[in-house]
């Protein structure tokens, strides 16, 4: 059994209900949102409308919708930022690095000059904060670990609008 992170209320459900300005794109089964932690400028997450925690919990229709949404935002990120690459990833359970108990699929434009290394940029922050990889998430370390990637609401809104304007028709 995979151990799940606990957050109540669910921050991704709150985005869907109360912070609609963070939504870049939407479909029947998904929302694409700007990640509040900009490890790379333009980092987005595709989330399910239905509150489920794991890839293992998704329906086949939701799985297909997630990849379609990820491709749409990846195309918009490519147009908007001309990145060197686009990283996609998803974590299942706290021991894989999942911090929010709501399915989300990261879509990250990798920029020239990035010093996060290869792979998910969040993992690089674990080492610098003294958190060994593969350990349970402790929200108490978020402030130190995420200090470098915090963006203001204005910056997030502007970035979201730039990406939104480049979504495929």
Q: What do the predicted segments below correspond to?
A:
Residues 1-169:
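HIT superfamily nucleotide-processing domains
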């Amino acid at each position: 059994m995979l151990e799940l992170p606990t957050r109540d209320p669910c921050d991704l459900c709150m985005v869907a209900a109360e912070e609609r300005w963070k939504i870049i794109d939407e479909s029947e089964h998904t929302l694409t949102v700007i990640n509040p932690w900009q490890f790379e400028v333009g980092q987005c997450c595709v989330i399910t409308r239905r509150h489920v925690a794991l890839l293992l919990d998704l329906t086949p229709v939701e799985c297909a919708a997630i990849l379609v949404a990820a491709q749409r935002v990846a195309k918009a990120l490519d147009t908007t930022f001309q990145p060197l690459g686009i990283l996609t990833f998803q974590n299942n359970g706290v021991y894989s690095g999942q911090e929010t108990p709501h399915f989300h699929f990261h879509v990250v434009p990798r920029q020239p000059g990035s010093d996060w290394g290869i792979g998910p940029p969040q993992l690089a922050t674990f080492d610098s904060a003294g958190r060994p990889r593969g350990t349970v998430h402790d929200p108490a370390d978020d402030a130190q670990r995420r200090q470098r990637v915090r963006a203001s609401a204005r910056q997030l809104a502007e970035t979201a609008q730039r990406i939104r304007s480049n979504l495929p028709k």
